[in-house]
Amino acid sequence: MAVYEQTGTEQPKKRKSRARAGGLTVADRLKKWKEYNEIVEASAVKEGEKPKRKVPAKGSKKGCMKGKGGPDNSHCSFRGVRQRIWGKWVAEIREPKIGTRLWLGTFPTAEKAASAYDEAATAMYGSLARLNFPQSVGSEFTSTSSQSEVCTVENKAVVCGDVCVKHEDTDCESNPFSQILDVREESCGTRPDSCTVGHQDMNSSLNYDLLLEFEQQYWGQVLQEKEKPKQEEEEIQQQQQEQQQQQLQPDLLTVADYGWPWSNDIVNDQTSWDPNECFDINELLGDLNEPGPHQSQDQNHVNSGSYDLHPLHLEPHDGHEFNGLSSLDI
């Protein structure tokens, strides 16, 4: 759906509508909702039941907050329409079920903005939509519905036998089911009941498959849009935590900071060492493993390498005694 911008003197310029986070434009979303509503209504009519839907959104009539917006904003009573400060009118609408807001564009008058809201509401909510101009839209729907009924009556799809031929309806643009299996066999005249039952079964299965496919695609896109901001927030939080940890973590010294060689350098340096400069650790620790003196050994006998005792406590080992020690001045 293209959005038009108009001013008092300039000619209308066609511009592309903005794409949302999921990559779909407003026109694409409205088209999907329109197809979905047409399929639901058609399947409900064939089964003889009313389509089950939620109550459509009322649409805000308050416009902007009090004291905000343009001068005529407080006098506007259209749904989903409000006025900017500079006088332009904007239209917005919320999607069914999820309630996400769709921006419909900027318009020179409130009536055009209200018409854009009605168009979007009709596409999203079908016949249950709450509109600003229900009479004008109702007349348009009656004309299109009469055309679709004529097209449906003239081009009935018949299923019979095992042979199927695909037929596309090109004469009626308002028919939501333009792609219907049209099978025509001469043997259908002999089995009208079986043909009717087969036709109903195929239509119901086709409608169910289309509804299921549409819902899966739509809700998949909605979930992706909702998960994107969460993923972005988680990534931002992780980055902030990493930065905080880096700031709080002290500057730790590594082996390289002390100038110690790496293992590869040690292996390479072993080839340049002199074997005479090396020693065995077992030889160094051998003396520690030798047994000490026996407890029964005389404490008065001292080894030759002992210097712990006073010289007066030493006894001669050759049979001579120390004479005249009293005259020594100690």
Curated annotation (Swiss-Prot):
Composition skew (Low complexity), residue ranges: 237-248
GO cellular component: nucleus
InterPro entries xrefs: AP2/ERF_dom (IPR001471), AP2/ERF_dom_sf (IPR036955), DNA-bd_dom_sf (IPR016177)
Tissue and organ expression note: Expressed preferentially in roots and stems, and at a lower level in leaves.
Biased composition regions of type Basic residues, renumbered to the chain: 51-65
Keywords, ordered alphabetically: Activator, Coiled coil, DNA-binding, Nucleus, Stress response, Transcription, Transcription regulation
Ranges of compositional bias, category Basic and acidic residues: 310-321
TM helices/strands, residue ranges: none
Positions of the UniProt region annotated as Disordered: 1-24, 46-71, 225-248, 283-330
Residue range(s) of DNA binding per entry: 77-134
Main localization of the protein described in the UniProt heading: nucleus
GO molecular function, one term: transcription cis-regulatory region binding
Motif Nuclear localization signal: where in chain: 13-54
Positions with biased composition (Polar residues): 1-10, 294-306
UniProt xrefs under Gene3D superfamilies: AP2/ERF domain
Domain of life per record: Eukaryota
Coiled coil: 230-247
Induction conditions: By high-salt and drought stresses.
Pfam families linked: AP2
Gene Ontology terms describing biological process: heat acclimation; pollen development
Cellular localisation: Nucleus
Family label: Belongs to the AP2/ERF transcription factor family. ERF subfamily.
Purpose: Transcriptional activator that binds specifically to the DNA sequence 5'-[AG]CCGAC-3'. Binding to the C-repeat/DRE element mediates high salinity- and dehydration-inducible transcription.
Protein name (database record): Dehydration-responsive element-binding protein 2B
Gene symbol of the encoding locus: DREB2B
